[in-house]
């Protein structure tokens, strides 16, 4: 099999329970496989349980509301802010333990409203990418249920994502294609 024949990564959808049900509710089937994590500890548990799943490349899609002001993704009550030593330590531990590598994660996407528009959001994207040594994407627009399909985030809307590295080159110089 050639590298170009590889199938695209599938999303590993992990949502904050405070938004998941209302966000994906409706007549259209959206995000069929959805796991919940209301804290970083629960996120770790979800990821460890996924080690038993069949091997395949995945994007780790963290789904939740963003905070007011800084627009940081929130899992439960915890904003994903890499300046917070607890949050940074959590992701350092994931990297040290190679948990994302063992899960074949190829990218992390912080799927909440406008998680890549503020300086704080862009800094978190860059620091998280540096820590986990993977591309990390945030959103440039508010997210709605229409941005999802049965698998999760709809690739047709990849243009509203921006990769952490692109935020260095002039505050979101343009989208970098999301996996």
Predicted ranges, named:
Residues 1-52:
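A domain-level signal for caspase-like cysteine endopeptidase catalytic cores
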Residues 1-13, 31, 56-60, 102-113, ...:
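Hydrophobic beta-strand segments of well-ordered beta-sheets in folded domains
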Residues 26, 46-48, 123, 149-152:
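Surface-exposed beta-strand edges and their flanking turn/coil or helix-capping segments
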Residues 31-39, 77, 81-89, 156-160, ...:
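A signal for specific C-terminal beta-sheet/loop modules enriched in small/flexible residues
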Residues 44-71:
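Short, well-structured hydrophobic secondary-structure segments
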Residues 62-63, 70-147:
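Catalytic cores of nucleophile-dependent amide-cleaving enzymes
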Residues 138-179:
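Caspase-like cysteine protease fold
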């Amino acid at each position: 099999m050639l590298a170009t024949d590889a199938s695209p990564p599938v999303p590993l959808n992990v949502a904050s329970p405070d938004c998941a049900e209302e966000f994906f509710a409706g007549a259209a089937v959206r995000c069929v496989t959805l796991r919940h994590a209301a804290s970083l500890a629960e996120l770790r548990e979800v990821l460890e349980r996924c080690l038993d799943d069949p091997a395949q490349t995945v994007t780790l899609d963290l789904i939740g509301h963003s905070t007011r002001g800084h627009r940081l993704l929130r899992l439960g009550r915890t904003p994903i802010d890499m300046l917070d030593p607890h949050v940074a330590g959590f992701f350092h531990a994931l990297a040290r333990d190679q948990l994302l590598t063992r899960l074949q994660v190829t990218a992390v996407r912080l799927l909440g409203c406008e998680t890549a528009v503020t300086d704080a959001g862009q800094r978190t994207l860059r620091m998280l990418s540096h820590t986990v040594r993977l591309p990390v994407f945030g959103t440039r627009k508010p997210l709605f249920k229409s941005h999802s399909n049965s698998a999760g985030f709809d690739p047709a809307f990849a243009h509203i994502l921006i990769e952490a590295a692109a935020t260095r080159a002039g505050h979101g110089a343009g989208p970098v294609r999301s996996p």
